[in-house]
């Protein structure tokens, strides 16, 4: 394949498609600013009035999980390392089941808005503040990178204006988050996940035509060693094996679906626990669809460039730029379609950023403002929540600008963001699964988990694993035209995700570097979680944890699992009451109701509350 292939460039119709995606997203925000009386209370703004249905929430969960980093990065991952990444279909299943059956029942029962409220209810306010502040710092940092990274990759390949895209993304997200609250975020995500699927579909269809069929793409991938689905090597130092993806990946992504405010806030906004669980399980199908699309795009990349790798031949300066390069290569004769793919990538960015802004506003209001200013009315809290959305939107845009100056530190920042999730998962698991865990054990376990996960993570940045541990597959350039005719425009600065400036070169390799620091990155969260649990349990036992009298609402109980089967019981039985009757004339919060609702009447409602 000739590397001098004439690829296309962005035209007016591509910009029109991209602008249309932004305008529709903004219009959804305007609609939900006024629909149903607008955002009258903080609960309306932050939780959608706790009236959301399963399907839109499921699509929102999928959209916000699959950022532009996924749209651009996963196909490049498959191109470089093979389709073993597809084992994540198993990982996603475990993640969703754990989130739905372990964490959701407790969070939904308590009726909380901020995930970190649980930490105060279960332990103390100090631990709650630790979790809140850590989440705020991490999320601002990560969101800025999510805005900047895909903008840079697309700019260097397509010529798409870098800062125009960064500012437009940040402003539009802030606009519809501020006006429409969680409902706008969810329904915009529904629209954006459709754009993501359409963008992937356009690439898959045209790649299949260009490469003469799906069978040809799969045949090329097989001959090139890309269909490496099964690697059962138990060595934890290998970057991706079946075990690192299933075990390490489950811990890594449960930190997001199980305890991260951005995701938890969505499913506990559902109108019933059944809808909340359904949203997670329907979302699983969405995750599988998006992953399948991105895996196939990676195989199409290899089929197209198996004889002349654009990265090795300097046609692109970073592996993340391969998907935009492919789009301009195979879709150059279809004006507007390359713009659809850019809209696909930015839909991932918009969904992630909007979810982050809404979650940041929620934890700030619930964890930092309401406890200190208890006299504030719901209307005032709603206005404050909107103000927080504006503030955090501006901070995320500012972080994107700062990201452009950080260079090699970006990868370290992203890695640290992933590492701190493990100890937090361990902290929540300690509270929900260990009845005798106390605040001393929780805080000590959290600190120990952070220390060990940061140690291995930062060490891996300073002394990265050797190539034989990462198992990159060979890339060929024998089919390239060495004259590189017309390719000067592709000479760009290197993507800042290379950590070369942050690494210590020419250092003598020690056993610590070749073993501890070479651990698969997917095990960082695993180590943090298990360390937090182990130390937390040990310290709790030695500091009188068994003597505490704990409210069972804060724990996962057998009834939480058995209640899944209540749907099969007849619904015409009489209610069984506990000793505490409902007061006449009051409207009870179902999360704190003293009535044990074993069965419902024929209407399916109790005191106006739909089950």
UniProtKB/Swiss-Prot annotation:
<keyword id="KW-0325">Glycoprotein</keyword>
<feature type="short sequence motif" description="PDZ-binding">
    <location>
        <begin position="609"/>
        <end position="611"/>
    </location>
</feature>
<feature type="transmembrane region" description="Helical">
    <location>
        <begin position="133"/>
        <end position="153"/>
    </location>
</feature>
<dbReference type="GO" id="GO:2001142">
    <property type="term" value="P:nicotinate transport"/>
</dbReference>
<dbReference type="GO" id="GO:0015718">
    <property type="term" value="P:monocarboxylic acid transport"/>
</dbReference>
<feature type="transmembrane region" description="Helical">
    <location>
        <begin position="162"/>
        <end position="182"/>
    </location>
</feature>
<keyword id="KW-0769">Symport</keyword>
<feature type="transmembrane region" description="Helical">
    <location>
        <begin position="416"/>
        <end position="436"/>
    </location>
</feature>
<protein>
    <recommendedName>
        <fullName>Sodium-coupled monocarboxylate transporter 1</fullName>
    </recommendedName>
</protein>
<feature type="topological domain" description="Cytoplasmic">
    <location>
        <begin position="360"/>
        <end position="389"/>
    </location>
</feature>
<feature type="topological domain" description="Cytoplasmic">
    <location>
        <begin position="540"/>
        <end position="611"/>
    </location>
</feature>
<keyword id="KW-0812">Transmembrane</keyword>
<feature type="transmembrane region" description="Helical">
    <location>
        <begin position="52"/>
        <end position="72"/>
    </location>
</feature>
<keyword id="KW-0406">Ion transport</keyword>
<keyword id="KW-0915">Sodium</keyword>
<dbReference type="GO" id="GO:0006848">
    <property type="term" value="P:pyruvate transport"/>
</dbReference>
<feature type="topological domain" description="Extracellular">
    <location>
        <begin position="206"/>
        <end position="239"/>
    </location>
</feature>
<dbReference type="GO" id="GO:0140161">
    <property type="term" value="F:monocarboxylate:sodium symporter activity"/>
</dbReference>
<keyword id="KW-0739">Sodium transport</keyword>
<keyword id="KW-0472">Membrane</keyword>
<feature type="topological domain" description="Extracellular">
    <location>
        <begin position="461"/>
        <end position="518"/>
    </location>
</feature>
<dbReference type="GO" id="GO:0015705">
    <property type="term" value="P:iodide transport"/>
</dbReference>
<feature type="transmembrane region" description="Helical">
    <location>
        <begin position="440"/>
        <end position="460"/>
    </location>
</feature>
<keyword id="KW-1003">Cell membrane</keyword>
<keyword id="KW-0043">Tumor suppressor</keyword>
<feature type="topological domain" description="Extracellular">
    <location>
        <begin position="1"/>
        <end position="9"/>
    </location>
</feature>
<dbReference type="InterPro" id="IPR051163">
    <property type="entry name" value="Sodium:Solute_Symporter_SSF"/>
</dbReference>
<dbReference type="GO" id="GO:0015552">
    <property type="term" value="F:propionate transmembrane transporter activity"/>
</dbReference>
<dbReference type="GO" id="GO:0015730">
    <property type="term" value="P:propanoate transmembrane transport"/>
</dbReference>
<dbReference type="InterPro" id="IPR001734">
    <property type="entry name" value="Na/solute_symporter"/>
</dbReference>
<dbReference type="GO" id="GO:0015129">
    <property type="term" value="F:lactate transmembrane transporter activity"/>
</dbReference>
<keyword id="KW-0813">Transport</keyword>
<dbReference type="GO" id="GO:0005343">
    <property type="term" value="F:organic acid:sodium symporter activity"/>
</dbReference>
<feature type="topological domain" description="Cytoplasmic">
    <location>
        <begin position="261"/>
        <end position="279"/>
    </location>
</feature>
<feature type="topological domain" description="Extracellular">
    <location>
        <begin position="301"/>
        <end position="336"/>
    </location>
</feature>
<dbReference type="GO" id="GO:0006915">
    <property type="term" value="P:apoptotic process"/>
</dbReference>
<keyword id="KW-0053">Apoptosis</keyword>
<feature type="topological domain" description="Cytoplasmic">
    <location>
        <begin position="108"/>
        <end position="132"/>
    </location>
</feature>
<comment type="function">
    <text>Acts as an electrogenic sodium (Na(+)) and chloride (Cl-)-dependent sodium-coupled solute transporter, including transport of monocarboxylates (short-chain fatty acids including L-lactate, D-lactate, pyruvate, acetate, propionate, valerate and butyrate), mocarboxylate drugs (nicotinate, benzoate, salicylate and 5-aminosalicylate) and ketone bodies (beta-D-hydroxybutyrate, acetoacetate and alpha-ketoisocaproate), with a Na(+):substrate stoichiometry of between 4:1 and 2:1. Catalyzes passive carrier mediated diffusion of iodide.</text>
</comment>
<feature type="topological domain" description="Extracellular">
    <location>
        <begin position="73"/>
        <end position="86"/>
    </location>
</feature>
<keyword id="KW-1133">Transmembrane helix</keyword>
<feature type="topological domain" description="Cytoplasmic">
    <location>
        <begin position="31"/>
        <end position="51"/>
    </location>
</feature>
